[in-house]
Amino acid sequence: SGTIINISSQAGRRPFFLQGPYCAIKYALNGLSETLAHEVAKFGIRVVLVEPGVVRTPIFGKNALPDEDKEHYEMLQSRTVRMITKGLMETGCDPIDIAKCMEEIVVSENPKMHYLLEQDARDNIRVYDEDGPEAWIEDGKIEDDDEYFKVQKERYGYDLS
């Protein structure tokens, strides 16, 4: 018996531009965790996913584009920085909140399978599920930043710019 806690991300439920490898790993971790939960349940082992939104850490400073990609992806990189900076300042999750969630899971007799932390993550997943990937793909065609952030504000209900 026991509890396995995997730290995933909202990126395991929806994609984020310029984060393809990260999203792929988190999607895989979610699938692995849900499969494992089924397989080990008969042994009294619980598998739980903690899925924070933006976490206030320096990880995002490491996402510089290689020179050969700047011409094609600089706009997306700029949007990513603006959105994450806004998220970090206003809605970001403190790492201590993740630790507290893990503590709650360990002492709980019946933890949920998924703990989607912070309102930004819940909003992102809700909107992505409601609007579908097609809307997100269409948003990728918007080249004007002001228009892009206007659409995002209408979709999510808060200013991401």
List each model region and its residues.
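Active-site-adjacent segment of SDR/Rossmann-fold oxidoreductases
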Residues: 14, 35-46
